[in-house]
């Protein structure tokens, strides 16, 4: 199921998004997280918050964020929600689940999901039963609360993030602007990362080896990519 980010985000948004007591990426990551969730009845409030936050962000981060906001405000919640489903639920190349790019729908992805969930739990953070821990909106939300700890998680999946960004641009999806904004908060791609992006683009994510059973508990094994989460 697509995260809707309504249970936790309102309680933890105000200080982070205003920049109080946080390092620079935290306010950006918080609003990027909210805007990468499914557009629902809270969208108008999120857009207003994001406008205020964008005014205080560096231009490379703020400019693409404003481009997304312009589109969302023109489009409205219902049409944007329909676009969201078309882009993220029906197009494998636009998968928002970061471990998919590194591991595909293999047993290794289940192990990676379990590791991420344990990382969250060690920090006292809990997911709902409907949320997978590697959805970009979820990763960004938690990164906003622990910027240094979770920057590593984002950079570990830098190649997948870049491939998602490129795929969104290829399809003309407005969320490409949000990925531009996210990328502007991270270090530039290194040579190895560029090679990984090129390899992923050419070959796609890994496929499961025949005859090997999953090593993670069944509850942490994702459904195949391509449907609502």
Located regions from the model:
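Charged, alpha-helix-forming regions
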Residues: 1-7, 16-136, 140-229
């Amino acid at each position: 199921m697509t995260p809707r980010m309504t249970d936790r985000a309102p309680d933890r948004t105000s200080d982070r998004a205003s920049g109080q007591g946080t390092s620079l990426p935290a306010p950006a990551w918080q609003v990027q997280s909210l805007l990468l969730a499914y557009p629902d009845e809270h969208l108008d409030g999120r857009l207003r918050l994001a406008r205020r936050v964008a005014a205080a962000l560096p231009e490379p981060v703020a400019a693409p964020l404003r481009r997304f906001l312009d589109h969302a405000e023109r489009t409205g919640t219902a049409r944007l929600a329909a676009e969201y489903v078309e882009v993220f639920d029906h197009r494998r190349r636009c998968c928002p689940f970061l471990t998919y790019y590194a591991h595909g729908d293999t047993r290794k992805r289940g192990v990676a999901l379990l590791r991420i969930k344990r990382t969250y739990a060690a920090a006292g953070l809990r997911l709902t039963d409907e949320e997978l821990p590697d959805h970009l909106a979820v990763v960004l939300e938690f990164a906003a609360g622990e910027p240094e700890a979770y920057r590593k998680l984002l950079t570990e999946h830098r190649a997948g993030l870049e491939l998602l960004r490129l795929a969104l641009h290829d399809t003309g999806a407005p969320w490409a602007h949000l990925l531009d904004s996210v990328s502007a908060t991270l270090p530039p791609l290194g040579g190895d990362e560029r090679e990984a992006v090129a390899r992923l683009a050419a070959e796609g994510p890994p496929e499961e080896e025949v005859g090997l059973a999953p090593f993670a508990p069944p509850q942490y094994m994702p459904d195949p990519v391509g449907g609502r989460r």
